[in-house]
Amino acid sequence: MAAITSNVSRLEPMRGISIIIESPEVATATPPPATTTATAEAEAATKQVAPTAKSNSNTEMSLKSQAAGMLLAFGDTAATAKDNLETSYDTAAKSTAAPETNKIYPQLLLRIGGEIAGATASAEAAASAATAAAATATSPTIISCNGEIAASQAAATAADTAATLQHNNTVKIQIESQGQQRTLGKQISVVKLNEGVEEMQQHMCYLVDTSGQYSPCETLDSGTGSDLENHPQQQQQPQQVRSPQLELHLQTTRLMVNEEADHKHSPLETPSPVPKRAYSLTDDSEECDESSNSSLSCDSLHSGGLLPTTLLRDIRFRERASGPLVTKINGRPLQFETDGYYTFHVREHENFRSFGSNSSTEYEAQHFTDEQPGEDFVGFRDIRTAGKLAGNSTIKSAKGTVRGVKNRVRNGVATFLQLQQPNVKNYMEKDVGKVVLYTTSMGIIRDTYAKCANVKKILRTLLIKFEERDIFMSVEYQQEMRERMQDETIRVPQLFVEGQLIGDANIVERLNESGELRQLLRPYKSIATAYTCQTCGGYRMLPCPACNGSKKSMHRNHFTAEFVALKCMNCDEVGLIKCPNC
């Protein structure tokens, strides 16, 4: 027994085949095996055995992967009245005609059928079920494998099978039903069987309990110690033998055996059809028990056995047509299918014009107008209100008459203040057409340095061409900030557009989030901001080419010791000049 157990454990797992047996009552002894017959319409590969008598409850059994190479047979010899699943088959029939010997088959053997008196034939199932004679109405249905088999069948069927003993290790299935023969060629042919089990005279059986476990002893203990408590031993009650109906479904390559086909219900009993779940070899026993208690299985729904095909098709079409189909967002086609579920509220399309090109239909729909100052206006215009009030600067009444012009007084005051300061540099004229940002490159104060970097990042993201003036690199820029801000304390960063102050880092961030900064700086957008200056590397300052940054003049007095050296007049106090390309 130990040798057989070790041989079975070395086998590869047998996946893809399991069998369902539905029996309302306990069956008695069944005859020796014969060649298999099946109909080509089954769908699931599981095996169920009904343990109790006079009950329609089925016991599910899921063959585990450790059951590879086991010899499967239903029933027992005529002497006993069991309904268990054994791994060996005793061919010693209790008949006075001819005594038979006990054999243990090393291949997978499935016997389904009623008891029919006949001779025992040792043969191999045919590779393709080509020829088969007409069988009786109660011809047995058997699945056998290559090797030595014991077939108890009609003489015509036994004569058609080839009597060879080669081990090809593949399952051959023959379909035979009342003289009509069908061949299942391609779907079921890949079950590998063991070939190293020797024949022994010792009778060893594995009794399968209702939880799906099999045990090498008669106590029905799977090793957990709970099988005897949860599952009592089955009652042995002999019943009349019925020839079951075997169905083979090619779609999922599974086998289903239905014994209720020939069962005749009594007039007092009403049949209650319960959908059966077909389990695979990897299902757990707990899952099988839970699914068997349910009144409806998933396989029956997916297979369409409960609903007509036309009704299922109408339901699927209705579900697809029920949801609205979103194909565009803001007039633009969706790049991905999931883009229809996102809603973006960022003002990304307000400035759709790309570097002066206004050919886009979306840009034309926005009705942007060029902010050109009116010819009747003389003086300085506030840069923060010029873009908003260029098209709607006039004040109109309800009847449409013009009652005035917006911000005319404000612009007049700005012009008056500029004319009253002749001694102060006119930065509006100096910085006309420019965006100037005063920053610092000194990183000692982290907060100030981070704010400067953030403002520069915002301007570069908007592709704005601006002039950066580093007050840490030049004393001249520090003096400009004091004059512009009219304060001795210098606070950076500060943004100026057309010579007018826009604000510090907080104001720039707020304008950027509201979208006003994009509209304000739209005339200064340039693709040249994506490129770095090759001369200065983006620093906008270069060492003086005259003194090479040493501040010593080339015109030195080498004859007297009164004047040691003259300072260079071409650069600033640190020996730097502005980049000519920037």
From Swiss-Prot:
Compositionally biased region (Low complexity): 291-300
Coiled coil: none
Region (Disordered), start-end ranges: 217-244, 260-300
Biological process annotations from GO: sensory perception of sound
Bias (Polar residues) ranges: 217-227
This protein's name: Glutaredoxin domain-containing cysteine-rich protein CG12206
Transmembrane annotation, as ranges: none
Residues in Glutaredoxin domain copies: 423-528
InterPro entries associated with the record: Glutaredoxin, GRXCR1, Thioredoxin-like_sf
Organism: Drosophila melanogaster
Family: Belongs to the GRXCR1 family.
